[in-house]
Amino acid sequence: MRSNGSVRSYAAALLLAALGAHGADLSSPTGSSGLIMIDKVGGHVRFFDPKSDQELSSLVPGPDETIKPHDLAISPDHKRAYVTIYGDGVYGRNPHPGHTIAIIDLGSRKMVGSIDVSPYEAPHGIRVDASGRLYVACDLSRKVLVIDPRTGKIESAIDVEGTGHRLALLPDASKLYVANKSDRLFISVVDVKTRKMVGRVAMPNGTEGIAASPDGKTVLAADLTEPYLHVIATATDTEVDKIKVEGAEHGVYTIFYSPDGKRVLICLASGQVDILDAHDLHAPQRTVHSAGTALMGIGFAPDGNTALVGNHAQGTVSRIDLTHASLVGTFAAGKGVEMLAYF
């Protein structure tokens, strides 16, 4: 029979394992049921057969095709997708901002509702925790919203001081890190329990791409103008390392941990994808050149070896073999995919 101490240790280990699994799946979901793509340029959400790469259906998640979708989160049970409707522009130039989050049933591939976040505007980055609660950055309003999607209620509107564009949520949902792009030269740190901003991590040139490690110990932030990753220790919320992105001349768009937590993939405007060892960021990097440019989104196939990369500027998606760091093929997908995910 276990002692009380060993029972507690065993329970803690199970909890940590569960959090790690949730963290990987919630930030970089995967699955064999389907493939969803956010065709930002085309103003559509598109569904593809994950085996044949053939488009199955599409829908307009905003009021019309001009009010564009940008980001998405998949619910923990993989039954729903939540898509932010940003507006008719891009960061810094969004004259008619959106104010809704589309709710999509993944089984039927139909839009089943929306959440109106008014008076807040321009919802962009979105994350979901293990309970299903949503965290949404409304950049024009300088707020991160905490939303219960079951009721559509905005539980909190957290002032983050900057035009937060993308988010990283720790796997245990204890803290949230907000990339303020070029508006504020720091990352805003939010205590999720108190729903308050509790710190800043200086970013010399600003940052857009941001991702939390599956163990919750590290946040990676992409330098907005120079080819570096800033490594942040979440225990202290301080920068502890800086990684040069090999072969790059400019900043990084986005960062993704693979669902198994073994790899870090980073996307660059030039069309370059760099693959890093998540457990040794200083290990030699491997580079793949996609068949397009302005890379933003990555979807991880359930085989653990394949990733799809959205070529935002070309209206195509490229398939990458992660083991061999090679380009396998490319297929047409809307007019310009920003984010995508298997489910």
Regions found by a protein language model. Give the residues of each.
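Bacterial N-terminal signal peptides
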Residues: Y10-G20
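Bacterial N-terminal signal peptides that target proteins for export
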Residues: M1-A11
